[in-house]
Amino acid sequence: MPPLLPLRLCRLWPRNPPSRLLGAAAGQRSRPSTYYELLGVHPGASTEEVKRAFFSKSKELHPDRDPGNPSLHSRFVELSEAYRVLSREQSRRSYDDQLRSGSPPKSPRTTVHDKSAHQTHSSWTPPNAQYWSQFHSVRPQGPQLRQQQHKQNKQVLGYCLLLMLAGMGLHYIAFRKVKQMHLNFMDEKDRIITAFYNEARARARANRGILQQERQRLGQRQPPPSEPTQGPEIVPRGAGP
């Protein structure tokens, strides 16, 4: 009879140690019950405050910090769900109405479990897709998206090269056109100057001929100069025949 007493005591002793049960209970009590508690903001926080709190928490709970810790992934998904609800005005108003009406909304953990179950039955999604879905301008980079982005980059590069070649061609054509216009202008100017010079030279020749004719005419009208008359010779005295 006495030897059976320790066996009965072992059967009555709980399988889980009290410390483990207390830790689990404390973990359940410490787990946030609302999205505001999960993000660490008050219910009257602005959208910018919610965004800053999400960024701060996401750095701490991102799965890439400790890939071997599965709890980080679930907590990060809960955080993303809380940010998705509280960052949009309509969903946040509906969530606040549920809190005020007394009908308890789904806790972050329940919502995450429901979404996880739905995702297991649906098609596979890349990791951190829910995290990247919070931002409209950023998307997860899968192999197909990278190939598509690479193809788009090639197209943009081709368009840039075509524009550059077209610009060089237009620049060359414009340069040739301006050069031709300048040559035509200089030729026209040279033609005008040459014509003016030839006309002035012809006038000078004509004026020279007229002057020569006038001189000849004036020379014919004037009489030749008369010789001076000699007076009577004076014979000196003593000179006789």
From Swiss-Prot:
GO terms for cellular component: membrane. One of its GO terms (biological process) is response to unfolded protein. It is a single-pass membrane protein. Residues 88-129, 212-241 are annotated as: Disordered. The keyword Cell inner membrane does not apply. The chain crosses the membrane at residues 156-175. The keyword Membrane applies. It is found in: Membrane. Residues 88-99 have a biased composition (Basic and acidic residues). SUPFAM superfamilies: Chaperone J-domain (SSF46565). Pfam families: DnaJ (PF00226). Keywords: Chaperone, Membrane, Transmembrane, Transmembrane helix. Residues 34-99 form the J domain. Residues 119-129 have a biased composition (Polar residues). Signal peptide: none annotated. GO terms for molecular function: unfolded protein binding. This is DnaJ homolog subfamily C member 4. The lineage of its organism: Eukaryota, Metazoa, Chordata, Craniata, Vertebrata.
